[in-house]
């Protein structure tokens, strides 16, 4: 196992839910935290929580589907915290409906955020990881990225694509000692899941953001010579 102390992590979708839980879990391990989110007030609040744990924090507001905003946000975080050792691509959106019921604009927005967001942020961070011959990238996919359902065509398409991107990038950069992994959790009791009524009214029985964060910390602490390519975490009895 390796220590994570004094490393720097960048987390997208860092203002609530999985992003917030991961930021706090990593901060407890001595990791400095950079946060990117659409709502400045949310990521600023989490940054203050992180600082209270005795590590450095920086935040920037950006829409991950906008490459220029992403590049500016990453530069802003790096100016305060230095190079990024760990990237958690967590930002995502969902909208469910029949194939003919979702508009082309709705489809495109889901793909832009869930897939192109991963692309833009990774592209902004990866060159320095290659130069240093070290780094960790964890992309949050979903069980919906492993199987489709009648009303998840757009969301599943985006999350299947994240798995393909992750697998391909992993094969490309492992020679640089960069570990690229994907997580495929079932329903997590995040703000988004609760708002979309995906927890069947029992959010306390399904996986919590803190559960996923705990797993990511353990995965990142593995000796750098090994990594977990893909992991699926499920709720036991939702």
Swiss-Prot record:
Active site: 155
Source taxon at top rank: Bacteria
Keyword Oxidoreductase included in the entry's annotation: yes
Record-linked Pfam families: adh_short
Record-level Gene Ontology MF annotations: oxidoreductase activity, acting on the CH-OH group of donors, NAD or NADP as acceptor
Top EC class, one word: oxidoreductase
Family: Belongs to the short-chain dehydrogenases/reductases (SDR) family.
Protein name as it appears in the record: Uncharacterized oxidoreductase YoxD
Organism of origin: Bacillus subtilis (strain 168)
């Amino acid at each position: 196992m390796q220590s994570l102390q004094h490393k720097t992590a960048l987390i997208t979708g860092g203002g609530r839910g999985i992003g917030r839980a991961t930021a706090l879990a990593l901060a407890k391990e001595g990791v400095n935290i950079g946060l990117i989110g659409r709502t400045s007030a949310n990521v600023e609040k989490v940054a203050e929580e992180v600082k209270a744990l005795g590590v450095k924090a920086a935040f920037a507001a950006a829409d991950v589907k906008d490459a220029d905003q992403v590049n500016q946000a990453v530069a802003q975080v790096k100016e305060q915290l230095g190079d990024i050792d760990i990237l958690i691509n967590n930002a995502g959106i969902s909208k469910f409906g029949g194939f003919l019921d979702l508009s082309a604009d709705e489809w495109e927005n889901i793909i832009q955020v869930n897939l192109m967001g991963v692309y833009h942020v990774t592209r902004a961070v990866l060159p320095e990881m290659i130069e240093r011959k070290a780094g960790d990238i964890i992309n949050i996919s979903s069980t919906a990225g492993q199987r489709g359902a009648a009303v998840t065509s757009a969301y599943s398409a985006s999350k299947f694509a994240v798995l393909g991107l992750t697998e391909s990038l992993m094969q490309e950069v492992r020679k640089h000692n960069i570990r690229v992994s994907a997580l495929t959790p079932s329903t997590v009791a995040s703000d988004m899941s609760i708002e979309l009524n995906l927890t069947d009214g029992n959010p306390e029985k399904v996986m919590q953001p803190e559960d996923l964060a705990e797993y990511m910390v353990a995965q990142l602490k593995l000796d750098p010579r090994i990594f977990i390519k893909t992991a699926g975490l499920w709720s036991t009895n939702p």
